[in-house]
């Protein structure tokens, strides 16, 4: 796997391919970031982008994790005191999950977003950006149904963060796409260069395969979940014997294998009794998905292997969270 393939694997969109190929020619020391609102315990949505960050560290890039306390405050996620306490927990969980501490810089948003130069640039972007453009960028990620003035400022700050953190590449889920496109369009208007962007997929709701896996709606898996919790949630997951269910529905079990399990494990062992053919060993997602579609791999057996793998991935962060809480 060459540098470009490693940088872009398991992404939903590369903006632009030409720019990222140029970056991949010499990735050593290049700076890449993801920003997270400190608003709860890490869940599989956070960890999907963390998997991509680990790919980029393997390619030699330096990772910046923005713990966006000001953004979280603007998005009604609590007081600054509450948000910053959560930020400390998130940092510990990310490191326990597998981010290389020597290659990861954790930055609190308020450490630079309240400085005069940043504020003046923010005002300049406000002059250059239409209200409708900012509202469109924020629509998918705002909290609550009532638009607020803070929600319009939020995406402009995300755009400026890319400049002020001295980044070469930005990462986010597809729900961040409109914000990143705004950044590429508007940063040049205030004298800064646009940066390339990678977008990771949005995994479907575990229970239905519709919409997206969410910590606020439907079923998701987080570092608070016990082994039994994970087994219960995965056992009840939607898993038709196909990669491509009808309509906009997806197979979340296969998505979790593709985006969470195979990037972290060299092989996946599906345990089965001898009378049902014995264990199956997979070294690639494609082989596992093929067997599910052919009927060689039963959904119940696939779910058992998935639950075991997710539990192993989450265990270090779960243990760290318990230590922080004194449990």
UniProtKB/Swiss-Prot annotation:
It is found in: Cytoplasm. The keyword Aminoacyl-tRNA synthetase applies. Its EC number is 6.1.1.1. It catalyses: tRNA(Tyr) + L-tyrosine + ATP = L-tyrosyl-tRNA(Tyr) + AMP + diphosphate + H(+). NCBIfam families: PRK08560.1 (NF006330), tyrS (TIGR00234). HAMAP family: Tyr_tRNA_synth_type3. Homodimer. Belongs to the class-I aminoacyl-tRNA synthetase family. TyrS type 3 subfamily. This is Tyrosine--tRNA ligase. It comes from Halobacterium salinarum (strain ATCC 700922 / JCM 11081 / NRC-1) (Halobacterium halobium). The gene is tyrS.
């Amino acid at each position: 796997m060459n540098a470009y393939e490693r940088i872009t694997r398991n992404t939903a969109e590369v903006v632009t391919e030409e720019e990222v190929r140029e970056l991949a020619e010499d990735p050593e020391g290049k700076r890449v970031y993801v920003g997270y609102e400190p608003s709860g315990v890490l869940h599989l949505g956070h960890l999907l982008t963390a998997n991509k960050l680990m790919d980029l560290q393997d390619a030699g890039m330096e990772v910046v994790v923005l713990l966006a306390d000001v953004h979280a405050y603007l998005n009604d996620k609590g007081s600054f005191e509450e948000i910053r306490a959560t930020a400390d927990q998130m940092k510990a969980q990310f490191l326990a999950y597998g981010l290389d501490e020597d290659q990861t810089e954790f930055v609190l948003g308020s450490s630079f977003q309240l400085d005069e130069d940043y504020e003046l640039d923010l005002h300049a972007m406000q002059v250059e950006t239409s209200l409708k453009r900012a509202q469109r960028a924020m629509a998918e990620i705002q909290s609550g149904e009532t638009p607020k003035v803070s929600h319009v400022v939020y995406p402009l700050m995300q755009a400026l963060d890319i400049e002020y953190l001295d980044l070469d590449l930005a990462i986010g889920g597809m729900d961040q796409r409109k914000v990143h496109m705004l950044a590429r369009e508007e940063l040049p208007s205030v004298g800064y260069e646009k940066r390339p962007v990678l977008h990771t997929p949005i995994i479907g709701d575990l229970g239905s395969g519709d919409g997206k896996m969410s910590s606020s709606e439907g079923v998701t898996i987080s570092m608070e979940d016990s082994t039994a919790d994970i087994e219960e949630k995965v056992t009840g997951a939607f898993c038709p014997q196909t990669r491509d269910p009808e309509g906009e529905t997806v197979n979340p079990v296969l998505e979790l294998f593709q985006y969470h399990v195979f990037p972290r494990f060299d092989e996946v062992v599906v345990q089965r009794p001898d009378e049902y053919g014995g264990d199956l060993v997979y070294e690639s997602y494609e082989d596992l998905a093929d067997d599910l579609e052919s009927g060689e791999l039963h959904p119940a057996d696939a779910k058992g292997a998935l639950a075991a793998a997710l539990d192993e991935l989450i265990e270090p962060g779960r243990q760290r969270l318990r230590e922080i809480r004194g449990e």
